[in-house]
Amino acid sequence: MIEVRFHGRGGQGAVTAANILAEAAFLEGKYVQAFPFFGVERRGAPVTAFTRIDNKPIRIKTQIYEPDVVVVLDPSLLDAVDVTAGLKDEGIVIVNTEKSKEEVLEKLKKKPKKLAIVDATTIALEILGLPITNTAILGAVAKATGLVKIESIEEAIKDTFSGELGEKNARAAREAYEKTEVFEL
């Protein structure tokens, strides 16, 4: 089983990202689970969402405390939250940032096995006209993890958002997929 934990802020679409990743894996014939964790969150407050993917039915129903993959939608969270808490030794961290690999690693409390960075904010602004990075960051997830194909991400996005909005969001994911830098550490 692969467990993915998303870190974002209220209103950024972390929950939607977790759901779209689950749908993309489902489209590939996998068993999935996606769910948010809500405390007293409000717009702008830190939010956590989770996705589990497996080749067999998933029976566990808890939050994800030891993720295989951590996805950070808002780079300011690197200063506010220990996003690597519980990260497995072979873990992957994916960060939306314009900063360098070295700058990101300085902020992580635990060094991942693999780090992926992409400026999903700029991609979202250019394509969507809004700094909502949830669909763009899924392109980085596809590239860095190989969990799902980018085509499955695009299809799941178009299932979630209809018409031109779906097309633009799928394009944002594809562009992020192409621009993501992946570093083996």
Curated annotation (Swiss-Prot):
Pfam families: POR. It catalyses: 2 oxidized [2Fe-2S]-[ferredoxin] + pyruvate + CoA = 2 reduced [2Fe-2S]-[ferredoxin] + acetyl-CoA + CO2 + H(+); 3-methyl-2-oxobutanoate + 2 oxidized [2Fe-2S]-[ferredoxin] + CoA = 2-methylpropanoyl-CoA + 2 reduced [2Fe-2S]-[ferredoxin] + CO2 + H(+). One of its GO terms (molecular function) is pyruvate synthase activity. The keyword Nucleotide-binding does not apply. The keyword Ubl conjugation does not apply. It is an enzyme of class 1 (oxidoreductase). Keywords: Oxidoreductase. Transmembrane segments: none annotated. Its EC number is 1.2.7.1, 1.2.7.7. Gene3D superfamilies: Pyruvate-ferredoxin oxidoreductase, PFOR, domain III. Heterotetramer of one alpha, one beta, one delta and one gamma chain. This is Pyruvate/ketoisovalerate oxidoreductases common subunit gamma.
